[in-house]
Amino acid sequence: MRGGVLMDVEKIDAYTVRFQFEQPHGLFLKALASGRGYDMVDYPAHYLKHFHPTFTSKETLDVMTQAAGFDFWYQLWGDKRDWRNMNLPRLWAWTIAEPPPAQPVVFVRNPYYWKVDPDGNQLPYIDRINVEIYDPETINLKAINGEIGMQSRHLQFGNYPLFMENRDKGGYRVLHWINGAGGSNILGINLNQKDPVLKSIVGDRRFRIALSHAMDRDVLNEAGFFGIGRPRQVSPPPSSPYYDPAYEQAYITYDPVIADSLLDAMGLKQKNEEGIRIRPDGQPVEITIETTAFNSHLLELVAGYWTAVGVKTKVKELARQLFYQRKAALMHDVGVWGGADEQIPTLDPRWFMPYSHESIQAIGYSRWFRSDGAKGEKPPEDIQQVMALYRQIEESMDESEQIRLFQNILDLNRENLWVIGTVGGMPSLIVVKNTFRNVPEIALTGWSFRSPGNTAVECYAIEAID
């Protein structure tokens, strides 16, 4: 939808369609090339029309709906288009044969897949993929023991020495792919805080800049990433055409003196007997960092640094579902998550503006943005300025102009520091069995790329063992 009008799709021929919008949509092709492009092929009409009232009688739909255990036709329709439906026609290289809760979840070669290799052999090469679902600790142990064909997610960087030491024993190799994210352990201070006094405090840029200067990122880098990473804010990585070294390095110097002076200047000079600063209402300045076991030992270090400058901080680990529930209800003080796709930040600018429910620093403002002001909380002028710049980016068909406009967004982020970065620049670790072939030595990772989906996984192969 552009300009409040749904797009128009025109069929040109059996293989060509034309998309028309009310206003220019400069990010449309990039979105199609990203994970969002799946939506274009997720609704096979010849199958799903049997479960839609436009094409099937109400009587027939009612019978099918009740037989499937649903109350409404749209519940049946949603169930039939779910990726776990084994009967749903797919263009994927593999189709699902045993969906969750099966263990393992099984995908099998799609005999109708549309790609062939240079010799005319139909792809994919691999006939069957077993996806075993475990907790992160078990995943890491299995990877170290060589019990996984390939693993790219949930590998804990703290296990890096073990991954490297056990390569020969486990019969695997460790690839170091380029990380397209802007950092790890990103701290999103809730600007839509429900406590009005705390909201006023965290809404002051001096508070956020003070907390940034209060952290020793070199210690965080050594403790969590063996010094391999680089202290930085949440900025596009050096491999990105949007890279901005000025924002990357803003306020990252460890300097508690600067932190103290900024907090004093805010009027938070008075402290209690524990050295914790006193709010205007007489209460101590206290915040909680909420995380989903995202390098909690590093966050305990962060809490110590912040407490040392008079902002009492504790860390709370939550189950992912509860974490999401609390942030949706704007109940968190500080939420922690990793980078997204800062390589191409225009596709998902969650860390540069209140863009979506993943913009943990200002979900209330993101609701205002997504609803054109109908919902959520109206943001201050500087954030509205960022939103207006992004709307201009959406309407520009010139990537150089998109980069120029986004630089203005980065400038405003550098000035305001709406989110606080810690460390970034670590490679994405990929553990691959030695019998697993055609996996590139170097690739770019990112959520929008659906990595490793951007590495021609249909060409992966398993070497025969005599």
Model-found features: residue ranges?
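Extracellular/periplasmic solute-recognition and catalytic clefts
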Residues: T95-V108, Y112, N130-P196, D218-F225, ...
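Surface-exposed binding/hinge segments that line
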Residues: R2-L76
